[in-house]
Amino acid sequence: MDVGVGGKAAKKAVGRKLGGPKKKPVSRSVKAGLQFPVGRIGRYLKKGRYAQRVGTGAPVYLAAVLEYLAAEVLELAGNAARDNKKNRIIPRHVLLAIRNDEELGKLLAGVTIAHGGVLPNINPVLLPKKTAEKADKPAKASKDKAAKSPKKQARS
């Protein structure tokens, strides 16, 4: 230990040099390579009192999961918008994306999306039968001729 003038120990530089340039702070989101805010999610986890203590990896993991889900929904919604020849994603496109995807549909089954509407769905029982439709057309035409009133038959 170095003892300076007056008998006091000289302070040693710990961490960085005393006169050196200060490094620019790097956020945890940048370190993890994420777009979602790791620090904010960590703060929400602590404030929400979900547990007495929150580990350092928990907000990073949660931010990564949320970012992945958001990217997945946005990609599918963008595809739905393109299918409808639109350049802007609207709530309807988000709903179509979620409900048409099996896993996302199961995850968000109880979620209502405002202005999303519903999936187009007609019960097959209510649809007209195609085979019977073709067979009925000639029969209807012959019935129409036979069902004409006597006055109309006399005119033709």
UniProtKB/Swiss-Prot annotation:
This is Probable histone H2A.6. The keyword NAD does not apply. Its main location: nucleus. The keyword ATP-binding does not apply. Contains one SPKK motif which may interact with the minor groove of A/T-rich DNA sites. Phosphorylation of this motif may regulate DNA binding. This motif is reiterated in both termini of histone H1 and in the N-terminus of sea urchin histones H2B, but its presence in the C-terminus seems to be unique to plant H2A. GO terms for cellular component: nucleosome; nucleus. The nucleosome is a histone octamer containing two molecules each of H2A, H2B, H3 and H4 assembled in one H3-H4 heterotetramer and two H2A-H2B heterodimers. The octamer wraps approximately 147 bp of DNA. It comes from the Eukaryota. Keywords: Chromosome, DNA-binding, Nucleosome core, Nucleus. InterPro entries: Histone-fold, Histone_H2A, Histone_H2A/H2B/H3, Histone_H2A_C, Histone_H2A_CS. Belongs to the histone H2A family. It comes from Oryza sativa subsp. japonica. Core component of nucleosome. Nucleosomes wrap and compact DNA into chromatin, limiting DNA accessibility to the cellular machineries which require DNA as a template. Histones thereby play a central role in transcription regulation, DNA repair, DNA replication and chromosomal stability. DNA accessibility is regulated via a complex set of post-translational modifications of histones, also called histone code, and nucleosome remodeling. Residues 130-147 have a biased composition (Basic and acidic residues). Pfam families: Histone, Histone_H2A_C. It is found in: Nucleus; Chromosome. One of its GO terms (molecular function) is protein heterodimerization activity. A motif (SPKK motif) lies at residues 149-152. GO terms for biological process: heterochromatin formation. Residues 9-26 have a biased composition (Basic residues).
